[in-house]
């Protein structure tokens, strides 16, 4: 469960290492985000040569959560960290980076993030 002030690892090569959640989108009083949800984030830690800098406010999609998710077939999928991928805008869901590190959840394909799924090395 991702909420306001949660720190997330960044699973792409944009240059950001860690971001903090500012807002969970899609709902006026929505509190929690899970895999496949879009959040507004602020870059907390970044490498100097990256395309994003510390303090920038961006959109990101959640790709891994420690909380996990219950699937319809009864399986439960949880990851070792909370991670996101930075996207260009809310309309086309295109990732800003060209590589995605680590596994991502299969639920992203169902929610329309096909470009993120195609860049990922492993889909669980």
Swiss-Prot record:
Entries under Gene3D superfamilies matching the protein: Ribosomal protein L14
Any one Gene Ontology cellular component term annotated for this protein: cytosolic large ribosomal subunit
SMART domains associated with the record: Ribosomal_L14 (SM01374)
PROSITE patterns, A to Z: RIBOSOMAL_L14 (PS00049)
Keyword Mitochondrion: no
Single GO MF annotation: large ribosomal subunit rRNA binding
GO BP term, pick one: translation
Keyword tags: Ribonucleoprotein, Ribosomal protein, RNA-binding, rRNA-binding
Disulfide bridge map: none
Annotated InterPro entries: Ribosomal_uL14, Ribosomal_uL14_bac-type, Ribosomal_uL14_CS, Ribosomal_uL14_sf
Function field: Binds to 23S rRNA. Forms part of two intersubunit bridges in the 70S ribosome.
Subunit structure of this chain's protein: Part of the 50S ribosomal subunit. Forms a cluster with proteins L3 and L19. In the 70S ribosome, L14 and L19 interact and together make contacts with the 16S rRNA in bridges B5 and B8.
Family, as annotated: Belongs to the universal ribosomal protein uL14 family.
PANTHER family per the UniProt record, alphabetical: 50S/60S RIBOSOMAL PROTEIN L14/L23 (PTHR11761), LARGE RIBOSOMAL SUBUNIT PROTEIN UL14M (PTHR11761:SF3)
Designated name of the protein: Large ribosomal subunit protein uL14
Source species of the chain: Mycoplasmoides gallisepticum (strain R(low / passage 15 / clone 2))
């Amino acid at each position: 469960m991702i909420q306001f002030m949660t720190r997330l690892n960044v699973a792409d090569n944009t240059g950001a290492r860690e971001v903090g959640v500012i807002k969970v989108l899609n709902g006026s009083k929505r509190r929690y985000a899970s895999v496949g949800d879009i959040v507004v984030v602020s870059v907390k830690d970044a490498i100097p040569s990256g395309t994003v800098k510390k303090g920038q406010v961006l959109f990101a999609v959640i790709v891994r959560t420690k909380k996990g998710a219950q699937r319809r077939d009864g399986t439960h999928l949880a990851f070792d960290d909370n991670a996101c991928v930075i996207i260009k805008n809310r309309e086309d869901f295109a990732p800003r980076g060209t590589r995605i590190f680590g596994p991502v959840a299969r639920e992203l394909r169902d929610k329309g993030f096909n470009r993120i799924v195609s860049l990922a090395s492993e889909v669980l």
